[in-house]
Amino acid sequence: MTKYAKIIGTGSYLPPRRVTNQDLAAQLAEKGIETSDEWIFSRSGISARHWADPDVASSDLAVKAAEQAIEAAGIDRQSIDLILVATSTPDFVFPSTACIIQNKLGINNQCAAFDLQAVCSGFVYALATADKFIRSGSHRNVLVIGTEVFSRILDFNDRTTCVLFGDGAGAVVLSASDEPGILSTAMHSDGSHVGILCVPGNVHGGAIAGNAFLHMDGQAVFKLAVTVLDKVARETMAAAEIQPEQIDWLIPHQANIRIMQGTARKLGLPAERMIAVVHEHGNTSAASIPLALDAAVRDGRIRPGQTVLMEGVGGGFTWGAALLRM
């Protein structure tokens, strides 16, 4: 049985269209909705976000990120034997976005490919799932992707939510290894909180039934997120017998700088050991953690041998964490 699943390559992609808070304020003003750069930044830490063009799908963003990750890993893409895609904004109702990505990447080895939906916790859930497949010995090289086009489900009459989210994709290649990689993972959910963060629409009779825009009770999400993130981080560290002071980098879900800072503070980690890209990306849901990871790998902050704690929280309510050695 394989001992570890190790990240051997990372990649990311943001659509070219960058929308600043000033741009968004001007757009909303045309609808008679008031907001400002100061209002948005003071509540979220967000200065800008990237939005995909109307003809660009989640799979298109994912392919760009995956190409980078595969190149960084230095493997033949035909050796990938599982593709896991975390997304809440799939290309189609079905088939899975993972199958679409498999085809676009030209991976023709008939490997398994499926989507996983845990909203903003999605990448951590997918990473944990990939870890289990590799540790079982059934798979050796797994492509894990978080990709979202949340701009498609935003209600631009609701200034409390439409200013927060962006589009993007991040990817990693996990490979079977005798060297320490993923040390521990934890996943949790509580369906009694479905209503505080959701898109409650569905397809019926060939049309959207109900409300297909994102709804969020920001205060309820904030209160619950800070509590569960601290608990799951400690659970994951305890499972690996790691103390907070041994963590080199914290990569939280990039939702809101106040939630991110609150979690770091509870863990006793200084702000300079937290990877934060929320100011430039906004909340990219399942893409946020791999986007932040790739940025820090490529700029040299995260180096081989360092210990990284990832944690995410999202609609469901879902939350999870992964502790790994790079």
UniProtKB/Swiss-Prot annotation:
Transmembrane segments: none
Main location class: cytoplasm
GO MF term set: 3-oxoacyl-[acyl-carrier-protein] synthase activity; beta-ketoacyl-acyl-carrier-protein synthase III activity
Region ACP-binding, annotated ranges: 254-258
Record's GO cellular component terms: cytoplasm
EC number(s) reported in the record: 2.3.1.180
Domain of life according to the entry: Bacteria
GO biological process, one term: secondary metabolite biosynthetic process
Catalytic site: C120, H253, N283
Keywords on record: Acyltransferase, Cytoplasm, Fatty acid biosynthesis, Fatty acid metabolism, Lipid biosynthesis, Lipid metabolism, Multifunctional enzyme, Transferase
InterPro entries the UniProt entry points to: ACP_syn_III_C, ACP_syn_III_N, FabH, Thiolase-like
Subcellular location: Cytoplasm
Pathway: Lipid metabolism; fatty acid biosynthesis
Reaction catalysis annotation: malonyl-[ACP] + acetyl-CoA + H(+) = 3-oxobutanoyl-[ACP] + CO2 + CoA
Matches recorded under Pfam families: ACP_syn_III (PF08545), ACP_syn_III_C (PF08541)
Domain notes: The last Arg residue of the ACP-binding site is essential for the weak association between ACP/AcpP and FabH.
Subunit note: Homodimer.
Function in brief: Catalyzes the condensation reaction of fatty acid synthesis by the addition to an acyl acceptor of two carbons from malonyl-ACP. Catalyzes the first condensation reaction which initiates fatty acid synthesis and may therefore play a role in governing the total rate of fatty acid production. Possesses both acetoacetyl-ACP synthase and acetyl transacylase activities. Its substrate specificity determines the biosynthesis of branched-chain and/or straight-chain of fatty acids.
Family: Belongs to the thiolase-like superfamily. FabH family.
Name of the protein described by the UniProt record: Beta-ketoacyl-[acyl-carrier-protein] synthase III
Gene this chain is encoded by: fabH
